[in-house]
Amino acid sequence: FEHTDRNIFKIVNQLEIVGQEKRIPDGIVYVNGLPVVVMEFKSAVKEDTTIMNAFTQLTVRYRRDIPNLFHYNAFVVISDGVNNKYGTLFTPYDFFYAWRKVESTDKSNDGIDSLLTMVEGLFRRERLLSVLKDFVFFPDNSKGEQKMVCRNPQFFATHLLYENILGHSHINIKGDGKGGTYFGATGCGKSMTMLFLTRMLMRSRHLASPTIVLITDRTDLDDQLAAQFVNAKLFVGDETIINVETRKELGELLRGRKSGGVFLTTIHKFSEDINLLSDRANIICISDEAHRSQTNISQNISITDKGVKRSYGFAKYLHDSLPNATYVGFTGTPID
């Protein structure tokens, strides 16, 4: 993966494959002899064939008749020349998506030019290797029937956040701990982006086995995120993925920890009496809905008949307890 030029990339058109039946996929992408992508194309001008026919041909006929072709498959592509989508062999049709950008700063591209956008944006050699390395997810309990591949916003966001975290981490002399904020609308797959980012961080040689703290501000969100992450230990690369239930447990897990671990908790567990949990620099705090939980670090003063009362938001206690951590925010609401 580190040396793109040491890999052999081939695309083969109309290769006859004999299994239960003889099938002829329109295109197969090979990396070092392994068939990692299978493509099926239909014509946009023929009324009797559609992109849905391409989907059925791949996920039903080819899967049934030439299953050996998919032993090393990462994802499949369906196209009618105008509509161009990709997904895994187990992805429902409604969740096949186009790759709409070549670079993260480009405008989304649909229509006739979108096939070229997919080729340049997804099949560039180093881009394809990156997807194969970090962006194809098998849940731990999938039993081979579940597999997910990133969408292009998740891919770009993960890489941008990863590079920003490395640049701003306190492992650097001039690091300020500002890992960045990701804005994504509801339904854009923020939790999967968090998962892809966590995998890249845990595998980073620069961060040397970091500890990841995932923070939400509601118990139901915490439970949802925990269910996903606890089922991704192989993907993340760490057996210690724990949904933290109490402040006491949070302290026991973080104090004295030298490396590793992914801990999910709510912001409310960080209170005035939490004190210092760790001064390590390779701790990454990732907050979901950060506009609600990470903007209240200033002091609030209220005057009552009992005198002046000073208080802070939970975010202040979080930063005090992990002073050298790098902080990353995910939100569906734009914040400054």
Regions found by a protein language model. Name each.
Residues A44-K46, K269-S271, S293:
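Short acidic, S/G/P-rich loop/turn micro-motifs used as interaction or catalytic elements
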